[in-house]
Amino acid sequence: VSLDGAVDYSLQSKIVDGKLYVDQGLIAGCAGGGFENICAAADIIKGKYIGADEFTFSVYPASTPIYMELVKNGAVADLIESGAIVKTAFCGPCFGAGDTPANNAFSIRHSTRNFPNREGSKLQSGQIASVALMDARSIAATAANKGFLTPATDLDVQYKGQKYHFDSKIYANRVFDSHGVADPSVEIKFGPNIKDWPEMQPLPQNL
C-alpha cells in the first residue's frame, strides 16, 4: 500500500460469489510471450470467450518471428476470436508503458521484469493496483472463465504441442546488415534533439 497506508485497498472487494475476480490478464515479455506459452493459451481459450465485462486479456508475442508463426498456425485467430487483444512484440507491460493496470485493479501476468509503474503509474497521486505473477496457462484459464481466477489444472485441455519454425525473412527484409558493406559517404539524419559527438582530444599514451 502506498502513501504510508493513506490509500485504502483490499482484495476482499474482488471476491464475487466466493470466487476471486481479476480485472486484467497479460501474457507478455521476452519470457512470458514465448511461442509455447501462447500456443498453450490459445489451446485453452479456443472456442470460449472472455466476456464483455471489466476483465481484459492481452497477449504480446516475444518477437515478430514468433508473432508470424502464431498467425500461420492459427493461434492468433483463436485468441482474437475469444476477445483477447494480440499486440505487437513490445516490452511495455514490464516497464509500465503498456497495459498499466487501472486504479484499484487486480492484474495477473506472466511477464519478465518488475519495473516501477508496472503496478500503477500515479502512486504519488493515490493510485494503487495489485499485480500477481502467474503462469501463462492459468492466465488463459482465468480468461476462459471470464475473469474468475482459475488454475489451468482445473481444465481438461488437449494441448497440440505445435512446433516453432523460425523464418528469417522478417529480419532479412527489414533490418539492414552493414557488416562489411559500410558506406561512410551516407549522411546520417539527426532530429533536432540529437547532436553529433563533441570533439574530444585523443587519449595520451600514459594517463
Regions found by a protein language model. Give the residues of each.
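Fe-S-dependent hydro-lyases/dehydratases of central metabolism
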Residues: 1-207
